[in-house]
Amino acid sequence: MSSRSRSRASSAARITDEQIGDLVSKLQALLPEARLRSNDRVPSARVLQETCSYIRSLHREVDDLSERLAELLAAADVSTAQAAVIRGLLM
């Protein structure tokens, strides 16, 4: 591959500041935090920090729900059809 071809391929793969801003804006729209939904300009770093915090909280919630479900299944009658269906879905 010539250096000209590499240069063209490299520039085609680069993302513009406008594209980054658009992606951050879309990411911000996915966050449940009301304070981030204001019309004020929120720095990209803040949006990324809030996104990471939100993902961590979702992981904790999944862990808590998994633990709760395991407790419920352990307490349920092993022979019940519902417990068997739930166990099958989790496997």
Curated annotation (Swiss-Prot):
Presence of keyword Endoplasmic reticulum: no
Example GO molecular function: protein dimerization activity
Assigned keywords, A-Z: Growth regulation, Transcription, Transcription regulation
GO annotation (BP), single: regulation of growth
Function: Atypical and probable non DNA-binding bHLH transcription factor that integrates multiple signaling pathways to regulate cell elongation and plant development.
UniProt key word Transcription regulation: yes
Designated gene of the protein: ILI7
Domain of life per record: Eukaryota
SUPFAM superfamilies from the UniProt entry: HLH, helix-loop-helix DNA-binding domain
Recorded family membership: Belongs to the bHLH protein family.
Name of the protein this chain belongs to: Transcription factor ILI7
Taxonomic path: Eukaryota, Viridiplantae, Streptophyta, Embryophyta, Tracheophyta
InterPro entries (UniProt xref): bHLH_dom (IPR011598), HLH_DNA-bd_sf (IPR036638), PRE (IPR044293)
PROSITE patterns associated with the record: BHLH (PS50888)
One Pfam family here: bHLH_ILI
Annotated bHLH domain residues: 4-58
